Amino acid sequence: MDRLKQAFREFNEERDWDQFHTPENLAKSICIEAGELLECFQWDNNYDKEHLCEELADVISYCVMLADRIDIDLEEIVLDKLEKTKKKYPVEKAKGISTKYDQL
């Protein structure tokens, strides 16, 4: 994750784009790019893998930049969230079903 953060810092500093990367703008960009990612599946599942990868990279890029901007350890919060989700969906109750946790 540190390599990604550093690469984005350098890229943005070279272009003087940090001024535009407010938390609000980065959050908006995540939503916009997530919409573009969803478009890959709009009418069927016959997606172009290269295009899908580009859109997924855009979403992840903005997530990394937002986390860096607001000084959040992205790896830590994702792993913490996974632990919480494991508790909500214990294997013995959730395996093989898609029922929401409050209805297990």
Language model segments and positions:
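Flexible "arm" and connector segments at domain edges
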Residues: 1-56, 60-104
